[in-house]
């Protein structure tokens, strides 16, 4: 594992990116993004995960997070492993998935499910200025992708919480 992927301070605040293998557009289907959200909630409730900002795009997600009681690298490892398995199973069981055979072929190598790209590009956040830069980057992602005109319009994001537009889909923490 390279230096860019290391978590030096297991209880520090980090900006991370999880990318779907081969940048496959999987989270265009609500069933799969819901699995991601459910597992993030589980980690918040049972593993002490704190989420400060987040966005789920079609083929990746960005989060700013930390943890209190568990090692952050362990929580990330378990999260990626569990969501990979659950999303792969959801694809297998989804009769209406038009890309089913192709996705199953692409996301499995030998006997191993390969849903996520390796690593998570963790960057430790130590200052409010760097935090604000990363929050802006996260929330503007759907605008850059041409999905929405204003970042607060995108539902799979913490932006609504930040602007006070709506309660988001995940609990977020103040920095």
Question: What function would you assign to each model-found segment?
Answer:
Residues 1-175:
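Short catalytic/metal-binding and nucleic-acid-binding patches
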């Amino acid at each position: 594992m390279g230096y860019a992927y290391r978590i030096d301070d297991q209880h520090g605040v980090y900006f991370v990116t999880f990318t779907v293998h081969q940048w496959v557009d999987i989270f265009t289907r609500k069933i799969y993004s819901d699995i991601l959200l459910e597992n993030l909630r589980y980690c918040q409730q049972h593993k002490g995960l704190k989420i400060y900002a987040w966005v789920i795009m079609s083929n990746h997600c960005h989060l700013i997070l930390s943890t209190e009681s568990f090692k952050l690298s362990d929580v990330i490892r378990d999260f990626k492993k569990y969501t990979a398995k659950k999303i792969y199973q959801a694809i297998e069981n989804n009769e209406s998935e038009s890309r089913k055979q192709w996705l199953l072929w692409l996301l499995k190598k030998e006997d191993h499910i390969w849903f996520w790209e390796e690593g998570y590009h963790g960057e430790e956040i130590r200052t409010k200025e760097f935090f604000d830069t990363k929050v802006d980057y996260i929330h503007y992602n759907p605008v850059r992708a041409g999905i929405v005109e204003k970042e607060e319009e995108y539902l799979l994001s913490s932006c609504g919480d930040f602007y006070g537009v709506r309660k988001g889909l995940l609990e977020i923490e103040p920095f």
